[in-house]
Regions:
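A short acidic, often aromatic-flanked loop/helix-cap motif at beta-alpha or helix-coil junctions
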Residues: 42-46, 80-83
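Solvent-exposed loop/turn segments at secondary-structure junctions
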Residues: 11-13, 42-43, 71-73
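Residue-level recognition of beta-strand->loop/alpha-helix junctions
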Residues: 37-41
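Non-catalytic, surface beta->alpha helical segment in thiol-disulfide oxidoreductase systems
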Residues: 61, 66-90
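Disulfide-bonded cysteines in secreted/extracellular proteins and peptides
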Residues: 13-16, 53, 59, 75
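Short Fe-S-cluster ligation motifs
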Residues: 43-60
């Protein structure tokens, strides 16, 4: 099973830059995990998509991760173990 995940980020966001290293590690370690990166601060379409995924503005910040399979999300800078568990990677 391939897990499709969205990673919403801001180009100038320092937390997003830190998390990029972890998402790259996750994709290398688990080839069945596909992360689609969407920059939102400079792209209106991506901003609309993050608002659709972050219903009720529950996170309201970046980075924001959305699992298209489970419909669950993850907000902010987290540890690798939490990212891995949330992603469904095995």
């Amino acid at each position: 099973m391939i897990f499709m995940l969205y990673e919403f980020y801001g180009e100038e966001c320092p937390h997003c830059q830190k998390m990029l290293k972890l998402t790259e590690k996750l994709m290398k370690e688990f080839p069945d995990v596909k992360i689609i990166r969407k920059e939102v601060w400079h792209n209106k379409e991506n901003m609309a998509l993050v608002k659709e995924c972050d219903k009720d503005d529950a996170c309201g910040g970046l980075p924001f991760y959305y699992n298209t399979e489970t419909k669950k999300w993850l907000c902010g800078e987290v540890k690798y173990s939490e990212l891995k568990e949330w992603s469904g990677a095995k």
